[in-house]
Amino acid sequence: MIQAVTFDFWDTLVIDDSDEPARAARGLPTKVETRRQLFVEEVLRHQPGVSPGRAAQALQQALTAFGRQWKVEHRTPPVAERLREALALLGLGPTPGFDALVAAWEDMEVLIPPTLAPGVAEMLPALAE
């Protein structure tokens, strides 16, 4: 008897980045731009000697490593881990606003809900039976 079924969320149950047109319609920057801005602002708030460019570069390095882990190693590092890695590349530990930064990154994925992939709305109730 099947007791549980699991699914990959992005591009299986929902369409990744399908919320971007809704963000644009609301005059919001992309999630990528917003994440970068939030990270750079948090770094500069506590380490004003770090240039915005250097902070953005550290974040990009951490995100590149994340991409490798996700696509090659089939592992999804949590947001907090990715941000800690970016801070470590700057020689920093978690900032006083670290938890709020993590929450902002995570909440961004659900504040404007992504679109369900075709057939998902019909499939999930059928599987629940």
Task: Describe the predicted segments one by one.
Residues 119-129:
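Catalytic-core regions built around general acid/base machinery
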Residues 2-117:
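N-terminal helical cap/lid subdomain that shapes the substrate entry/recognition surface
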